[in-house]
UniProtKB/Swiss-Prot annotation:
Gene Ontology CC annotations of this record: plasma membrane
Membrane topology: Single-pass type I membrane protein
Claim: Transmembrane is one of the keywords in the record: yes
PANTHER family with a match to the protein in the record: KILLER CELL IMMUNOGLOBULIN-LIKE RECEPTOR 2DL4, MHC CLASS I NK CELL RECEPTOR
Cytoplasmic side: 351-422
Residues annotated as glycosylated: 44, 137, 200, 239, 299
Record-given protein name: Killer cell immunoglobulin-like receptor 3DL1
Family membership: Belongs to the immunoglobulin superfamily.
A single MF term (Gene Ontology): molecular adaptor activity
SUPFAM superfamilies given in the database record: Immunoglobulin
Subcellular location field: Cell membrane
Length: 422
């Protein structure tokens, strides 16, 4: 990995050059680009050249690659706007004094102008949480479907490019990527990172910028405290307010869930007790997890305090779903109970109908027997003897007993003879 540290804040750059001017390089001008030496294709860039010599009339030229006609024989004082830039503008530039036609001063140090947006942007993959503890190492990966020869990682603080890290690509099955390890982390490593891809044959022509990743350093100050204004047991459709309080004179407070920042910071307010506080209003739909808060200052927004103790919040959606599930369960139980009651009622009706009918039949039979007994009470004592003979389907019924066996006195005994003639 090759590290190249560049400062593109022109005032700071000039301060360093003025210090070196007193050390023997008085006639040498210095050159920088504003707002950055990485210029998106189609935009303009301002070249600034300055020195202690008077009068300050300069010329600038491009050392390599295609010549820029816009710069040919053009003089300027201190600044020169060029663009809209194309890939031909990529390269190394120098400036020099042009006081008299035959007098040319020493040339400035080279300034690289890089044109971005030539290729499709890569993707910068950050750690699971963008919050890094002081002293840790952080690994960022730049991925692309294009087989770039090299990747460049840039760090921005206060919208100014601070550092460029270059790493050769590593092939994988779906393109190429490069890993960048940063650390041990200090406040100087915090900031916004982006990455680019490029080819070795045109190192001044980069891809479009990846989406930015913010890396924040924690643990630089004492931790605040986080609490809920109301009970942490959430009620459906009810907002939750979290309060972050500290004795430290923080200017901003930040909220995170499971290590991921939640929205932007909130300005701190001093309470009646003299403490500094910020209140975070959460929407009715809350994701469950451990919440923490941090304190910071406006002039170093990427440097945070140690995290507060965690405050666990359940998800309101889960409670709502639980209420729905309980309601469905109660409804199912009621339906089952109603079905069971209906079945029991049907069984009782069938049972009642069956035994009512049987009782009616038994009563009718009892009435018939009682009627017969009332009509002929002495008949029960009669002795009946029946003889049946079958002969050609002719029936003869003799109610008279044989003469030889007839007693002299009348007898109530009756013998019935029946002959059947077949």
């Amino acid at each position: 990995m090759m590290f190249e540290f560049l400062s593109l804040l022109c005032s700071g750059f000039f301060l360093v050059q003025r210090m070196s001017a007193h050390m023997g390089s008085y006639d040498k001008p210095f050159l920088c680009a504003s707002p950055s030496y990485i210029v998106p294709q189609g935009q303009n860039v301002t070249l600034i050249c300055d020195s202690h010599s008077k009068p300050n009339i300069f010329k600038v030229y491009k050392e390599d690659g295609f010549p820029i006609l816009q710069l040919h024989e053009k003089t300027f004082t201190k600044s020169l706007d060029i663009g809209p830039v194309t890939p031909e503008y990529a390269g190394t530039y120098r400036c020099f004094h042009h006081q008299y036609p035959n007098e040319i001063s020493a040339h400035s140090e080279p300034l690289k102008i890089i044109i971005s947006g030539i290729y499709m942007k890569p993707f910068l993959i950050a750690p699971q949480t963008p919050l890094a503890n002081s002293g840790e190492n952080v690994t960022l990966e730049c991925h692309s479907e294009i087989m770039f020869d090299t990747y460049i990682l840039t760090s921005h603080r206060m919208e100014i490019l601070k550092e460029t890290l270059q790493h050769f690509q590593e092939s994988h099955f779906s393109g190429s990527y490069a890993s960048f390890t940063i650390g041990p982390m200090t406040p100087d490593h915090s900031g916004t990172y982006t990455c680019y891809g490029a080819y070795n044959h045109s190192l001044y022509e980069w891809s479009d910028s990846s989406d930015p990743v913010d890396i924040k350093i924690t643990g630089e100050y004492k931790k605040p405290s986080l609490s809920s204004v109301m009970s942490p047991v959430l009620v459906s459709e009810q907002n939750m307010t979290l309060s972050c309080i500290s004795n430290h004179q923080f200017e901003m407070f930040h909220l995170s869930r499971e290590g991921v920042p939640q929205g932007k910071g909130i300005p701190a307010m001093q309470s009646h007790s003299g403490k500094f506080e910020a209140k975070f209003l959460l929407s009715p739909v809350i994701q469950k997890g451990n919440y923490r808060c941090y304190g910071s200052f406006k002039n170093s927004s990427h440097v945070w305090s140690s995290p507060s103790d965690p405050l666990y919040l359940p998800a309101k959606d889960n409670l709502k779903n639980l209420h729905i599930q309980i309601g469905l369960l109660v409804t199912m139980v009621l339906v089952i109970v109603v079905i069971i009651i209906i079945i029991i009622i049907i069984i009782i009706i069938i049972y009642y109908y069956y035994f009512s009918k049987k009782s009616s039949i038994l009563e009718q039979e009892s009435e018939v027997k009682a009627t017969i007994n009332r009509q002929d009470p002495e008949r029960q004592e009669e002795h009946k003897v029946t003889y049946i003979e079958f002969e050609q389907r002719i029936f003869n019924k003799n109610l008279m007993p044989p003469i030889s066996q007839s007693p002299k006195e009348f007898s109530i005994d009756t013998v019935v003879y029946t002959e059947v003639m077949i």
